[in-house]
From Swiss-Prot:
It comes from the Bacteria. Its EC number is 5.1.3.24. GO terms for molecular function: racemase and epimerase activity, acting on carbohydrates and derivatives. Coiled coil: none annotated. The active site is at E247. Converts alpha-N-acetylneuranimic acid (Neu5Ac) to the beta-anomer, accelerating the equilibrium between the alpha- and beta-anomers. Probably facilitates sialidase-negative bacteria to compete successfully for limited amounts of extracellular Neu5Ac, which is likely taken up in the beta-anomer. In addition, the rapid removal of sialic acid from solution might be advantageous to the bacterium to damp down host responses. This is N-acetylneuraminate epimerase. SUPFAM superfamilies: Kelch motif. Residues 1-35 form the signal peptide. One of its GO terms (cellular component) is periplasmic space.
Amino acid sequence: MTQIYHQYKKKLSTKVILLSALTLCITFSLPYANAERYPDVPVAFKYGTGARVDNHLYVGLGSAGQSWYRLDTDKASSGWQKIADFPGQPREQAVTVALSGKLYVFGGVGKNSASDTQVRALDDVYQYDPQTNQWQRLATRAPRGLVGTAATTLNGTQALLLGGVNKAIFDGYFTDLAAAGGNETQKNAVVNAYFDQAPADYFYNRDVLMYDPAKNQWKSGGQVPFLGTAGSAITAKKGDLILINGEIKPGLRTAAVWQGKTQGTELKWQQRPDLIGAEKGAVQEGLAGAFAGVSHDVVLVGGGANFPGSWQQFNAGQLYAHQGLKKQWQQPIYALVDNQWQVAGKLPQPLAYGVSIQDKDKVILLGGETSDGVATSAVTQLSWQGGKLHLE
């Protein structure tokens, strides 16, 4: 039986390694070498998705509806171009992986049809061919509903999908809310019953899902040895997968970081250092909806959102851990250097739930939402050079 690591308890003090104020000043004043600033996306969007194929960046969905846009990074001054609209229903939190020169869009949260009255966890898959500018829905369904799922590829030919909510529980919550109608007492009962549960009782997905587009088949990549998460950041480093934070139940995030290495047909997992707090002695509440990537072998993580105080309430025995707390969008950027996290700098503004795209040794951050959920069209480039973080 696989041992599951239950990281419930959090220490209320965390060692933090801070760069000097002078270093931070230098970091923000110098763009990295040979950088060309990428233009903002034509529309502000959040909860969208995207990927890179060759020298083109693609983003769409979320609050952008069915729209998708493409940027040729070799001709960035020409700006973003609109491509064919997504043929499926509008959705948020879909994930996209570029495989063999095509985009594959998985799941999300939305309606099954235009006439549907309820959002639900979706399991459909769409393919986009840049050569023909055409979309098609594939004759397959993911083995799980894909909301809050993290996705990447380690070989460019197969997609790896991890985490995400339990479809039955997630869909059931919205069904029960709809059934309550205008009865506030009944609605409150539904909300309290949903949030007042232990992390394991949400049955977040622990299966590693592998999709092979050549065969249009799903396979098992084993199970993770820790609680399933939703909204984790994900990136790849030297052929290994890095899974960063995410929520272990609604409103409660984990600071854990895991590394997955391919071993046969499955992934072998090793825990990396937990993400540190943004200030000396501060608790790291964990992040959901953060941005992540790798630059010159340094893992970079920035932004995200959480509920400060949620771990304190949870450790005091309150399962509804974020009750009465205010959601906070985060600004710090962290770097994993020599297997140790440090606070490397800050984003231009608090930001979460956008798109991270790896572009060689740059990490491109596109869109997302700022404080109080306001969508942005901003594009920011991160890189690590000379022991410093650079933003453009």
